[in-house]
């Protein structure tokens, strides 16, 4: 599901809310989440999961085109850990 699909489905299920308002709300939620992670804070949505930053240590990588070794710097990457309710719900669907 893409962001556009999400907006479309939410707008269809919320007849009283125009698609433009749904789109603005989704964009604001995602912006706030990105901003929170950018500040180094953790996001927890009970029953769904949590978003945090994990540190990737510096390492030696490889350029796939040339095969040359490349030094990669350490960096923080977003990480999602699903909550118990989401994990159980997904496993029931199988």
From Swiss-Prot:
Recall the GO molecular function terms of this protein's record.
Answer: DNA binding; structural constituent of chromatin
| The UniProt record lists the keyword Amino-acid biosynthesis | no
- Keywords in alphabetical order, please: DNA recombination, DNA-binding, Transcription, Transcription regulation, Translation regulation
Q: Which SUPFAM superfamilies match?
A: IHF-like DNA-binding proteins
Biological process (GO) annotations held by this record are: DNA recombination; regulation of DNA-templated transcription; regulation of translation
Q: Per its UniProt record, what CDD domains does this chain match?
A: IHF_B
Going by the entry's taxonomy, the superkingdom of the source organism is recorded as: Bacteria
Q: Cellular component terms, GO, for this chain's entry?
A: chromosome; cytosol
Please give the subunit comment from the record. Heterodimer of an alpha and a beta chain.
Q: Which family does it belong to?
A: Belongs to the bacterial histone-like protein family.
So what does this one do?
This protein is one of the two subunits of integration host factor, a specific DNA-binding protein that functions in genetic recombination as well as in transcriptional and translational control.
What is the official name of this protein in its record? Integration host factor subunit beta
Source organism of this protein record = Aeromonas hydrophila subsp. hydrophila (strain ATCC 7966 / DSM 30187 / BCRC 13018 / CCUG 14551 / JCM 1027 / KCTC 2358 / NCIMB 9240 / NCTC 8049)
């Amino acid at each position: 599901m893409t962001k556009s699909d999400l907006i479309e489905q939410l707008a269809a299920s919320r007849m009283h809310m125009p698609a433009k308002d749904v789109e603005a709300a989704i964009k604001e939620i995602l912006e706030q989440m990105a901003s929170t992670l950018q500040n180094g804070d953790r996001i927890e949505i009970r029953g769904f999961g949590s978003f945090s930053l994990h540190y990737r240590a510096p390492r030696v990588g490889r350029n796939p085109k040339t095969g040359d070794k490349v030094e990669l710097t350490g960096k923080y990457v977003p990480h999602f850990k699903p909550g118990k309710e989401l994990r159980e719900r997904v496993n029931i669907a199988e």
